[in-house]
A protein has these predicted regions:
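Cys/His-clustered metal-coordination modules, chiefly Zn-binding fingers
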Residues: 84-138
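Interaction interfaces in information-processing and related assembly proteins
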Residues: 1-87
Length: 138
């Protein structure tokens, strides 16, 4: 399979195999007017299998969303067909409006204008909890 190179944009690389669609949805890439390529289960010498997302064009991406889904992913910034920056991600301590609280008793269920805020409570397990009701993010 051949996917063309990127002129200006970014490559989200080293995504754990099977996680790219979740990332695609959370980043809102379906709204992108630029070219987006999603590659699932690409062969990787380091990971065995991995997913990759290529964005050819300008589309704002929240790095905290990527780090929440897969903190081992890397970001490659491409300008004029050349890799100009490589970013490693840090697990975010706080997520705002990235995921919604699923607890029907949470105040965010009735107060629609409230931000959905989750904090990292168990860094070793990647567990986030709602600041209002302490429900775990799914």
């Amino acid at each position: 399979m051949i996917i063309g190179s990127i002129k200006n944009g970014m490559v989200i690389d080293h995504i754990t195999a099977g996680r790219a669609m979740e990332l695609y949805d959370l980043l809102g890439l379906e709204k992108a007017e630029c070219e987006v390529a999603l590659i699932k289960n690409a062969v990787s010498s380091k990971m065995g299998r991995k997913d990759i997302i290529k964005i050819n064009g300008d589309f704002p991406v929240d790095l905290n969303v990527i780090a929440y889904v897969d903190p081992r992913a890397t970001i490659n910034i491409i300008q004029d067909g050349v890799l100009v920056e490589k970013k490693a991600l840090q697990t975010p301590q706080k997520l705002v409006n990235v995921v919604k609280c699923q607890n029907p008793r949470c105040i965010t269920s009735t107060e629609q204008e409230l931000d959905h805020v989750f904090v990292l409570t168990e860094p070793e397990n990647g567990v986030y909890r709602c600041i209002y009701c302490e429900a775990q993010a799914k």
